[in-house]
């Protein structure tokens, strides 16, 4: 039987040394699923709420024993006996039990751990891979990686204001080749930085964190692509996560400041747009994430009008994997893509709903990790299951990041000749 027999949570540690929630779900026939919940550093104002203990004497207040207790009592009492194959009903039951818009009663971290673990247990019961259980029998598309190779913003202690500088191996013929190309650019960049006396230590997501200015980061990536024997734009493109809500001046709310490199200058939304235009014309940039503040709806409409046919504009903090915010963005013409983070919304079902809404509207969807990760590679299966065609899961270092790439290569091997890596076709509408 596929009935849920036992749900048990525990506190574990994520890649930043902070506590997070791990959940085990056992079914009545012995089938089993386990999931670990990620956590973000740069978080959107409208994300579902993580439940933290707030006890400053323990993990600086970041413990998750309350969330663990919630899983082991309220959630377990509600879900035990339900059919694990009914993912929608399980997630709906937790949402009803919570009763809030932002998951503040149970905590999104508690709910997500259970939701993911139930999906894994159901897949185990059916004897199918997780991607097959979530996506059905016709899912063969492998995602193009967005690999973070230079960290800035909140993810590092350097002077780079923008949070992530990433490479996308669009010229690869397979997932395995995409990983190889990305790794070779990563190592080429390390060599260039070391030769110039720059730091080669890595940030939260495995990318390097040298003390450069924003445009120098782009220049180094261009050199690394060439040093790896690859061609910019043909083989490898660049993607940015600007995390501009972190740059927005909350004091007078008039514009943006490069707090690390040039805190004395204030940039308007139009000046930010003009900067992106300049960079897009100069570098092989194919995707820009969170280019403006999460509350700047008018700015996003204008930016999309000016750049939406030239580059992928990804809403992360702007959409927070929330179908309500996404529906408004679609209606108003804001962005043309959404970043998908499971813990921004708190259940697998709501995550799938957001992806399907985006795809039905002609928006791209990019499955994403968080800066605080674990060895759990759920998002690798999710990207294949939902055929999003893109995944953002960090650099070619740190086992918490590499775990996802390794899982994608395993999936590709399992799919064999049926596997499809679209590469440049993913960005055909932007001239790639």
Curated annotation (Swiss-Prot):
Keywords: Cytoplasm, Glycolysis, Lyase, Magnesium, Metal-binding, Secreted. Mg(2+) binds at residues 241, 289, 316. (2R)-2-phosphoglycerate binds at residues 163, 341, 370-371, 392. InterPro entries: Enolase, Enolase-like_C_sf, Enolase-like_N, Enolase_C, Enolase_CS, Enolase_N. GO terms for cellular component: cell surface; extracellular region; phosphopyruvate hydratase complex. GO terms for biological process: glycolytic process. Its main location: cytoplasm. Catalyzes the reversible conversion of 2-phosphoglycerate (2-PG) into phosphoenolpyruvate (PEP). It is essential for the degradation of carbohydrates via glycolysis. This is Enolase. The lineage of its organism: Bacteria, Pseudomonadati, Spirochaetota, Spirochaetia, Spirochaetales.
């Amino acid at each position: 039987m596929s009935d849920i027999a036992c749900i048990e949570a525990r506190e574990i540690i994520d890649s930043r040394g902070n506590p997070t929630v791990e959940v085990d779900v056992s079914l009545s026939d012995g089938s089993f699923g386990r999931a670990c919940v990620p956590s973000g550093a740069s978080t959107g104002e409208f994300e579902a709420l993580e439940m933290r203990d707030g006890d400053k004497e323990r993990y600086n207040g970041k413990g998750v024993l309350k969330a663990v207790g919630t899983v082991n009592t309220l959630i377990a009492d509600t879900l035990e006996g339900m059919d694990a194959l009914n993912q929608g009903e399980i997630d709906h039951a937790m949402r009803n039990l919570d009763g809030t818009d932002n998951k503040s009663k149970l905590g999104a971290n508690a709910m997500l751990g259970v939701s993911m673990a139930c999906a894994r247990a159901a897949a185990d019961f059916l004897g199918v891979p997780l991607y097959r259980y979530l996506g059905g029998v016709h899912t063969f598309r492998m995602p193009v990686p967005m690999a973070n190779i230079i960290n800035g913003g909140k993810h590092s202690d350097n002077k780079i204001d923008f949070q992530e500088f990433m490479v996308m191996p669009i010229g690869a013929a397979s997932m395995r080749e995409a990983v190889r190309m990305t790794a070779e650019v990563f190592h080429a960049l390390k060599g260039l930085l070391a030769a110039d006396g720059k730091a080669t230590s890595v940030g939260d997501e495995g990318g390097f964190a040298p003390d450069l200015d924003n445009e120098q980061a782009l220049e180094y990536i261009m050199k690394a692509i060439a040093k790896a024997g690859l061609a910019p734009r043909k083989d490898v493109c660049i993607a940015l996560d600007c995390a501009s809500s972190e740059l927005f001046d909350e004091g007078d709310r008039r514009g943006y400041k490069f707090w690390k490199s040039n805190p004395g200058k204030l940039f308007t939304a139009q000046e930010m747009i003009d900067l992106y235009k300049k960079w897009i014309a100069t570098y092989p940039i194919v995707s820009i994430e969170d280019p403006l503040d999460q509350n700047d709806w008018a700015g996003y409409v204008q930016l999309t009008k000016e750049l939406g046919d030239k580059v992928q504009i990804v809403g992360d903090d702007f959409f927070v994997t929330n179908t309500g915010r996404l529906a408004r963005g679609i209606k108003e013409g804001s962005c043309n893509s959404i970043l998908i983070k499971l813990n921004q919304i708190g259940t697998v079902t709501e995550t799938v709903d957001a992806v399907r809404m985006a795809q039905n509207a002609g928006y791209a969807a990019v499955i994403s990790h968080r800066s605080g990760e674990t060895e759990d590679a759920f998002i690798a299966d999710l990207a294949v299951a939902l055929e999003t065609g893109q995944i953002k899961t960090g650099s070619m270092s740190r086992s918490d990041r590499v775990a996802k790439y390794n899982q994608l290569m395993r999936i590709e091997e399992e799919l064999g000749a049926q596997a499809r890596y679209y590469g440049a076709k993913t960005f055909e509408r932007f001239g790639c």
